A protein has these predicted regions:
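Short N-terminal helix-initiation segments at or just after the protein's N-terminus
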Residues: 1-3, 73, 130-134
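N-terminal leader/targeting segments
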Residues: 1-52
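Extracellular/secretory pathway and lumenal proteins
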Residues: 12, 59-60, 115
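Generic intrinsically disordered, low-complexity segments enriched for polar/acidic and small residues
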Residues: 25-26, 31, 57, 88, ...
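Exposed acidic/polar residues on beta-strands and adjacent loops within beta-sheet cores, strongest
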Residues: 29, 39, 47-53, 60, ...
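Long, charged/polar, surface-exposed segments that mediate recognition or autoinhibition
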Residues: 40-101
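A charged, solvent-exposed segment within the mature domains of Sec-exported extracytoplasmic proteins
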Residues: 78-137
């Protein structure tokens, strides 16, 4: 969870950096990097969620939704991402999601966070996920 809160909200995270600092079970893409000098990072796991241009997800063994929600809330607060907004209609919620929330990054950008459980390679796993939606018109 620490790796998620430390790195996943950074707009400067790249696929190479994600590979170096996130646990082995992570999923990352950034189709519209914050810095023009950074290369596009195509999806490393599941296909990109429709309507998003970035995902950072960490998964680990066990059921720890409550701790995951606390981790996400603390990371959002630390980054100053505090403006609540509605999860957009039609957003593709992950199977197993037990917590979902949306926050405004700026007037044109929204991030959606999800925490939940699902079957993993050795039993139940908990996932922490943040996806950045494509810019609003």
């Amino acid at each position: 969870m620490t790796a998620f809160s430390t790195h996943c909200f950074s707009p400067l995270l790249t696929a190479a950096r994600a590979e170096a600092v996130l646990p082995s079970r992570h999923d990352f893409y950034d189709l519209r990097p914050f810095r023009a000098a950074n290369d596009v990072s195509p999806p490393t796991g599941r296909a990109a969620t429709p309507g998003t241009d970035r995902r950072c997800e960490v998964a680990f063994d066990g059921e720890a939704v409550e701790a995951g929600v606390a981790t996400v809330a603390a990371a959002l607060a630390r980054e100053g991402i505090l403006t609540d907004t509605d999860v957009p209609d039609g957003f593709q919620r992950q199977e197993g999601t037990e917590f979902i929330a949306a926050r405004r990054l700026n007037p044109r950008r929204i991030a959606v966070v999800q925490v939940g459980t699902r079957p993993g390679p050795t039993g139940t796993e908990t996932f922490l996920n943040v996806e950045r939606l494509e810019p609003l018109p």
